[in-house]
């Protein structure tokens, strides 16, 4: 209602002393009165080239109304120490699988070494079985004929060389198999010893349960 009265007063359609008195003492009505005059001058093209606006109070009020945003508190994550991994239930569950995978990997390496060694031995055997080309002494143009000589090695020497290669190959294979069996036994004994220590520690300290001692 007051805005309509201010618009009529600005257009000269009405003249009310009470409205003028209220306009003189009401800051909000004064701002509305200024806005109406600015709008009318802008529509008529009577505005000056430079307009002075004081919006600092409104900006300050808007800033004060903005909620205060507090940054979220970052909680540092504590990583378990290496000596604590063995006491974790997950590690106790994964450890037997890791041991089995290690044994399978060692067995695969030994099998691969045996296969490669056999193939290498077969290749050497085929090479040694090929006869060498005999060397003949031809008759010269002038003079006497020289005796014919053959550069073929004896069968006994070839057989001895093959037997030595076979024995060396077998010795290497036996050494690899013995080393694998020794490593497997040492790893199995170490795993059993660590599991026994873990179970003994869980029994001695009350209130601590691991995956191996917890009842299903």
From Swiss-Prot:
<feature type="topological domain" description="Cytoplasmic">
    <location>
        <begin position="1"/>
        <end position="100"/>
    </location>
</feature>
<feature type="region of interest" description="Disordered">
    <location>
        <begin position="146"/>
        <end position="166"/>
    </location>
</feature>
<feature type="region of interest" description="Sufficient to repress sigma-E">
    <location>
        <begin position="1"/>
        <end position="97"/>
    </location>
</feature>
<feature type="site" description="Cleavage; by DegS">
    <location>
        <begin position="148"/>
        <end position="149"/>
    </location>
</feature>
<dbReference type="GO" id="GO:1903865">
    <property type="term" value="C:sigma factor antagonist complex"/>
</dbReference>
<keyword id="KW-0805">Transcription regulation</keyword>
<keyword id="KW-0735">Signal-anchor</keyword>
<comment type="similarity">
    <text>Belongs to the RseA family.</text>
</comment>
<feature type="region of interest" description="Poly-Gln (Q2)">
    <location>
        <begin position="190"/>
        <end position="200"/>
    </location>
</feature>
<dbReference type="GO" id="GO:0006950">
    <property type="term" value="P:response to stress"/>
</dbReference>
<feature type="site" description="Cleavage; by RseP">
    <location>
        <begin position="108"/>
        <end position="109"/>
    </location>
</feature>
<feature type="coiled-coil region">
    <location>
        <begin position="158"/>
        <end position="202"/>
    </location>
</feature>
<dbReference type="InterPro" id="IPR005573">
    <property type="entry name" value="Anti-sigma_E_RseA_C"/>
</dbReference>
<comment type="function">
    <text>An anti-sigma factor for extracytoplasmic function (ECF) sigma factor sigma-E (RpoE). ECF sigma factors are held in an inactive form by an anti-sigma factor until released by regulated intramembrane proteolysis (RIP). RIP occurs when an extracytoplasmic signal triggers a concerted proteolytic cascade to transmit information and elicit cellular responses.</text>
</comment>
<keyword id="KW-0804">Transcription</keyword>
<keyword id="KW-0472">Membrane</keyword>
<dbReference type="InterPro" id="IPR026279">
    <property type="entry name" value="RseA"/>
</dbReference>
<keyword id="KW-1003">Cell membrane</keyword>
<dbReference type="GO" id="GO:0005886">
    <property type="term" value="C:plasma membrane"/>
</dbReference>
<dbReference type="Pfam" id="PF03872">
    <property type="entry name" value="RseA_N"/>
</dbReference>
<feature type="topological domain" description="Periplasmic">
    <location>
        <begin position="119"/>
        <end position="216"/>
    </location>
</feature>
<keyword id="KW-1133">Transmembrane helix</keyword>
<dbReference type="InterPro" id="IPR052383">
    <property type="entry name" value="Anti-sigma-E_RseA-like"/>
</dbReference>
<dbReference type="GO" id="GO:0060090">
    <property type="term" value="F:molecular adaptor activity"/>
</dbReference>
<dbReference type="GO" id="GO:0016989">
    <property type="term" value="F:sigma factor antagonist activity"/>
</dbReference>
<dbReference type="InterPro" id="IPR036147">
    <property type="entry name" value="Anti-sigma_E_RseA_N_sf"/>
</dbReference>
<dbReference type="Pfam" id="PF03873">
    <property type="entry name" value="RseA_C"/>
</dbReference>
<comment type="subunit">
    <text>Interacts 1:1 with ECF RNA polymerase sigma-E (RpoE); this inhibits the interaction of sigma-E with the RNA polymerase catalytic core and leads to a decreased expression of sigma-E-regulated genes. Interacts with RseB with 1:1 stoichiometry. The liberated N-terminus (residues 1-108) forms a complex with SspB and RpoE; binding to SspB is competitively inhibited by ssrA-tags, although the 2 proteins bind in opposite directions in SspB's peptide-binding groove.</text>
</comment>
<dbReference type="GO" id="GO:0045892">
    <property type="term" value="P:negative regulation of DNA-templated transcription"/>
</dbReference>
<feature type="region of interest" description="Primary binding site for RseB">
    <location>
        <begin position="169"/>
        <end position="186"/>
    </location>
</feature>
<feature type="transmembrane region" description="Helical; Signal-anchor for type II membrane protein">
    <location>
        <begin position="101"/>
        <end position="118"/>
    </location>
</feature>
<dbReference type="InterPro" id="IPR005572">
    <property type="entry name" value="Anti-sigma_E_RseA_N"/>
</dbReference>
<keyword id="KW-0997">Cell inner membrane</keyword>
<keyword id="KW-0812">Transmembrane</keyword>
<protein>
    <recommendedName>
        <fullName>Anti-sigma-E factor RseA</fullName>
    </recommendedName>
</protein>
<keyword id="KW-0175">Coiled coil</keyword>
